[in-house]
Amino acid sequence: MVFFPHRHLIGIKGLTEQDITYLLDKADEAVKISRQREKKTSTLRGLTQINLFFEASTRTQASFELAGKRLGADVMNMSVGNSSVKKGETLIDTAMTLNAMRPDVLVIRHSSAGAAALLAQKVSCSVVNAGDGQHEHPTQALLDALTIRRAKGKLSRIIVAICGDVLHSRVARSNILLLNAMGARVRVVAPATLLPAGIADMGVEVFHSMKEGLKDADVVMMLRLQRERMSGAFVPSVREYYHFYGLDAETLKAAKEDALVMHPGPMNRGVEIASEVADGPQSVIAEQVEMGVAVRMAVMETLLVSQNQGPRTEGAGA
């Protein structure tokens, strides 16, 4: 039986509720492995994983590397600065070169939306999207979902408020797709200048007030203000942004008493979140990091083990 019929993980779009549940269940098993004294398995022994990062990353690249090594894979890291990359042709040339090395999986992070899908069309191995421009970041959404499910026991019928720089966030897009697929109620809270056009068509409720948007929320997911992606005046000032859209202890009171506080990292303390909240009892930010390794272990094992289990879809969805 083919439990996960996809060859690649390019995005959440294209995954069914069953696909997502399968990956989360598999990740739950990986958590147990990560908490053992002996963490290394031989599941992917003899297989090769190449991490190809065109954007600088610390936590995501380290998480993918650790995931592969805990499964026994041979892991190779390639960091390529965007200054030396001519998008498109160079990506294809790089793909051809790496494909000739016969890896089993390529993990790619790139500043251009669609880069992972393009790579998947050019190579014979599996491709995992570690973030492509403002498009998607599927493993982040999966690790967020795992964190929520382990804390709340479910994903359906919970209220999740995604707050901050939604416009520039691939994390927000992937989380919206996943949470909607799993039956959650999703809100976005942000100034109009930080919301993409047509956001309401994604099946979310839109709020411009933190107090209103957080009312009765089960989860408060803060997003980093991505000033490096801003070419114009999206916010009057950082100070004013924090005043209206930063999460501090007082603002958090609008949510449920047991609401989870999440952040994909890296955090801008004092910009979108106060230290008292980030380090407070409702924060599960550290748990998100732990779940990231487990989710990426689950994805690697699922894609590589499923290669010999029958036909799989080739679409960009997954």
Swiss-Prot record:
From what superkingdom does this record's organism come? Bacteria
Q: Which Pfam families match?
A: OTCace, OTCace_N
The yes or no answer to whether the keyword Signal is present is no
Q: Report the protein name in the record.
A: Aspartate carbamoyltransferase catalytic subunit
Indicate the quaternary assembly.
Heterododecamer (2C3:3R2) of six catalytic PyrB chains organized as two trimers (C3), and six regulatory PyrI chains organized as three dimers (R2).
E.C. number, please? Answer: 2.1.3.2
Record field: catalytic activity: carbamoyl phosphate + L-aspartate = N-carbamoyl-L-aspartate + phosphate + H(+)
Q: Which GO terms describe its molecular function?
A: amino acid binding; aspartate carbamoyltransferase activity
Q: Which organism is it from?
A: Rhizobium rhizogenes (strain K84 / ATCC BAA-868)
Q: What does this protein do?
A: Catalyzes the condensation of carbamoyl phosphate and aspartate to form carbamoyl aspartate and inorganic phosphate, the committed step in the de novo pyrimidine nucleotide biosynthesis pathway.
What InterPro entries does this protein map onto? Asp/Orn_carbamoyltranf_P-bd, Asp/Orn_carbamoylTrfase, Asp/Orn_carbamoylTrfase_sf, Asp_carbamoyltransf, Asp_carbamoyltransf_Asp/Orn-bd
Q: Does Endoplasmic reticulum appear among the keywords?
A: no
Residues binding L-aspartate are: 87, 170, 224
What phylogenetic lineage does the species belong to?
Bacteria, Pseudomonadati, Pseudomonadota, Alphaproteobacteria, Hyphomicrobiales
Any GO BP annotation? 'de novo' pyrimidine nucleobase biosynthetic process
